[in-house]
Amino acid sequence: MKRITIISLLTIAVMALSATSCKVQKKASETSSTTGIVVPSTPNQDPTAPVVYFTSDISPEGLVKIYEALGVKPFGRVAVKISTGESEESNHLRPDFIKNLVNTVNGTLVECNTAYGGNRATTELHRKAIAERGFEKVATVDIMDSEGDMQIPVVDSKHIKYDIVGAHLQNYDFMINLAHFKGHTMGGFGGVLKNQSIGVASSRGKLYIHSAGRTTSRWLDDDQDGFLESMAAAAQAVHNYFKQEGKDII
C-alpha cells in the first residue's frame, strides 16, 4: 500500500516548515546547527507539538535546505502543490525560486482551476497562464481537475457534507504543500490551509466551499463564517483522506 506524505511550507520573510513526527523533531535538533536552520526551543514544550523551522536564507538553496532538515525522503509520484498566480504581478512563488526543490524531489507541479473567472477558470486558459509564468520550464504541471473531480469525506463540519477535489489527486504518493503567505480579502490570510483546501478543490469544489455547502454551480460568498469553517473542514478532509487510506501525513 502506498504512503502519502504531505509537507507544508510557508514563505513570509522567513521560511517556516512544520512537521508532527517525534522522529522528525529529533532529526531537526541534529541538523539545525549544520544547515543554518533555527529550531526555537520552548521550555516544557509538548513533545507532540509541531516543530517549526526558520531560516533567513530566502533563496532556492535555502528552500531545499529547510526541506532536507526534515530528513524525509520522497517516494513514488511526488506532487508539489503551488498557486500559479492570477497574474504576473501576484505574489505567487516564482518558478526560479522553487525550481531546485522541485527537481530535488523529482516532483510534478499540481494545481486546480479557479471558480471566479479570470485567466485560470478553464484548463485551456490555465495552461496558457502556466506557460506565460514559466512553470512548465521547471517541471510537468498537472491541473488536477482537468479530467473531473472526486469526493472525499468530511468529518468536522456543519456546512459541507464532503470535499470535492481534483480527480488526479489520487495519482500521487507524496505531496509537498508549497504555499506563500498573503493577505486575502475573504479568507483573512492565505497560506498552507488555504492551499490544501481551496487549492486542492476542483472548480466545483471551490464553489461548494465558498457557498458553505449550498451549491456547486454558482458563486455565493454571503456567509463569511460558513465559508471559513468550510475551508478549514476541507483542509482537514484532505488530511483525513490520506490517513484513512492507510498512508501518512507529515
Label each residue range with its predicted role.
Residues 1-8:
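Bacterial N-terminal signal peptides that target proteins for export
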Residues 12, 33-37:
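Low-complexity, intrinsically disordered segments with a bias for serine/threonine
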